[in-house]
């Protein structure tokens, strides 16, 4: 990378190994979010697992999806609730949901 990207200062040192975030090109953000949300809704829409916390999360997610959330988009909302989702998926022993969440974390956050 000879020239810095527009708006970013040039590095004054060489990286020994590239950071994993060289580019977001080719990452399926929407697909990753959609898979994690499908797992999440399976639990939080079930009265046995839903509660006021998850009801508030769903309302905030609807606002983000509608573009009504000025300070929070869907990805940020998911990012800020990772630990709660991990707890829920671990409680349910849902290894597939945990794997999809890990992919979302590693590729998109």
UniProtKB/Swiss-Prot annotation:
Q: Tell me the InterPro entries matching this sequence.
A: CowN
Q: Which GO terms describe its biological process?
A: nitrogen fixation
Q: Which UniProt keywords apply?
A: Nitrogen fixation
Q: Which HAMAP family match?
A: CowN (MF_02117)
Physiological role: Is required to sustain N(2)-dependent growth in the presence of low levels of carbon monoxide (CO). Probably acts by protecting the N(2) fixation ability of the nitrogenase complex, which is inactivated in the presence of CO.
Q: What is stated as this protein's family in its record?
A: Belongs to the CowN family.
Question: NCBIfam families, per this entry?
Answer: N2Fix_CO_CowN
- What is this protein's record name? N(2)-fixation sustaining protein CowN
Gene expressing this chain: cowN
